[in-house]
Amino acid sequence: MSIVSFEFLGFLAALAVVYYVLPMRVRKWALLAGSAAFWLLCGWQGAVYLTAETLLIWGCARLIGRFSERRGVCRALLVGGMVTVFGAMVLMKALAQLQALPDGLLVPIGLSYFTFQSVGYLIDVYRGKVTPEKNYAKVLLFAGFFPQMTQGPITTWKQLMPQLDSPHRLSPDGFVSGVFLMAWGFFKKLVIADRLMPAVSMLVATAQELPGWLVLATAAMYAIVLYADFSGGIDIIRGAAELLGIDLPENFRRPFFAASIADYWRRWHISLGVWFRTYLLYPLVASRAGIGLAKVGKRLFGAKAGRAMPGAAASMVVFLLIGVWHGFYWNAVLYGLWFGLLTAAGMLLDPQFRKIRKRVTAHRGGVALMKAFGWLRTMAAVLLAQFFACTTSPGMAFGMMGRIFTDFGAGMTRNFPLGMQDGAVAIIAVLLMLLVDILCEKQSDLRKKLAVSPLYVRWTLLMGLIFLTLIFGCYGAGFDRAAFLYAGF
């Protein structure tokens, strides 16, 4: 079941009614029953996979709690659980990419998301940050909460479980806020992403015939499509959760306003970045290898470089894995390595950048100049990364980049696949999305202010947003065929 479908809206409405009608003490079980129904509607194989994985994680966590004084046993349980679930995930994704899955077997929707969430819980139990849960049903609900499991955001036990475990009263303000967020997500997905994606696909397929300016525009359009698609899906998910009284964390925070690569990744797919920093990057930096690398770096290059080297090396590892997470092909690896190299270089060269920044900002207008330079540098790096993301081979990616420098051109082209009307709608919709992002950047509590605004203001804006989506949205057959780009992960 796609979250962009009338079936999902009907399912959510029915579950919300049942949830708020039932006595408070049993409402969490209504969420579990509703989530189980959602898994089955998405495919029984995925439901079986999720059940088996959470059983393993629950069992390992319980045993870690039982043998907490025996670190060797606990470490073996942690490693065994992680290797098993990550190994199964990698195998499923590899077989799917090779089109070698047995007949009738499908990759569970949101496989990576609920796997990362489950493993995070197991690591937190091992570290003593979370008490092992005795009730398996709660672990199952935590990993498989139905809106979230499709494409995140990835949460921790302490973030999510207290909310799922506590009954919620129907809040008019929360309800309005959730509906607005869902409507805004539908707008971004259906009006922007699904309108631009076919055009981007056609442009990429004919890239060798395009002038360089249009190749560059294609990369920019693809970045917009990814943002509108992924953040739109997250908005729908967070809004649906808010209707049930659950507050999921923000997963995108205006990434195209970032002034550095590090800032960009603090704004883009936030929960994935937090997961990798918490469970991989920080442990790598604090490991014996990280400490040893710092000592070697200090001896060879000085104290500042020595302190930066463990973080730089760990960032390379993290971004390489993020690239592989996107797929088992060279473009995904290059995508991760590109951001890893930029992040590592930023860490190692930070002392030099600080000196330059200090000199420039000492002059009038220097602060604004550095901000503008930082933004342009970051967006150029992000645009180059899109060539790896939107193509299927390094040759295609580098070929598109080459067109920018060898045949930039300045004239129009007959190859642009977006008509005048669709182009106008797309431009206006993107500008509206940009305006909302600017307002949110200046006022982070914009939705809260909207929720308490006069009734006629709320309803006018909400009905207008729904009307625009219904009129200008692009719908697949049955209103659910345009799958989210990140749901397959």
Predicted regions and their residues:
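Membrane-embedded transmembrane alpha-helical bundles that form the catalytic cores
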Residues: 1-488
